[in-house]
Amino acid sequence: MKYISIIIVTLLFLQCSEKNNQLNEKRITVDLEERTETSVFDLMDSITVVPLESSDSCLISTIHQIEKKNDTLYIYDMQQSSFFCYKTNGDFLFKISDKGSGPEEYQYIEHFSVSETGEIFLLEPWGNIYHYGNNGIFIQKIKLPNVLKSYNEIYVRRNSIVINSLSGDILYFSLPDGTYQSFHLYERMNIFFPLKRTSVYNDSIMNVSLFDNQIYKIGQDGLASSWAWDFKENNNSEKDIKRLTNEIEYKSGDNHNSVMTDYIGKGKPLRQFIYTSCESNRFKIALMEHDNNFLHVFHDKSNKMNRVFTRTKENTIFHTCTYSDNTFIYFNQPFVKGWRDLTCITKEVLGEKYNLYKNIIDDYDSNPVVILFHLKK
């Protein structure tokens, strides 16, 4: 009887421990005031400077969007309406340049997505998708149902397509049979756009809410709560959001040219704002605005430790990078300007690779420079 009691107590303890672990995974608690001195190399396994092959057949004007899948880079150049595919060592693979008015030609590409197998999906803002194989050969044109005001972002996983609209609506579309569901995400609130808030992790398409730090998984049944950031006293309250709504309504009626940072920080409606939330094999990451500055939050899933910092020891920020496939991707963005220091690349970060980086950016005949920050696994 004594041994049975011990077994029961042990089982109950294990069940409670498992439940606590599940709760901890559902809510990541972070003290934004507790800063950690962090080096890029505390987070990254390695850094790659990619010298994109430059020839008459593959010259890029500007990089509008870039994605990485395994050892392949996918780049859309809006100025040329062309799509380029490279190996991560810089070798050119192929180019898609099918702008026109024919049945297999696109007029304007708003966004693109690449499947797990390397198939390419180019999205027009009025609801057409141009589907290409992993060799750049055209497969089909897909006409989406007319249920969104605009079609602004596309994300593909397995046989499912998710489309985000500037209006705050979502279309979930099945590739095999064309069935679909549409859902309302949240209202666009002036300068707080419901775009660039979606990321892909493994087989899941995830979205971060505008103000309450919730991370949702997008599926055929709509939004399912997955987990949340908890910034304790720095969480935005309902009162904060109400104040934000009132100020935006007041200023919009006065032709006020406001920017996001007018509403975030000390003495302003919002205590913090997540620009991007993404997840890698090892980290859960939030790139934020807090206390009138950029802020990084890296939660290490392997040891449950948090790193909170404004800049790395090497004076780097990742807010101007794109996240894709366990990698932060930096590329020259001449149109990105601001009153803050947006430095990402320094000598301390690149070390002996800095000369290669400088040679690329100083060569006016070469393609834009791309740098890959490979996160630890």
Where are these regions (language model features)?
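C-terminal motif of bacterial Sec signal peptides marking the signal peptidase cleavage site
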Residues: 14-15
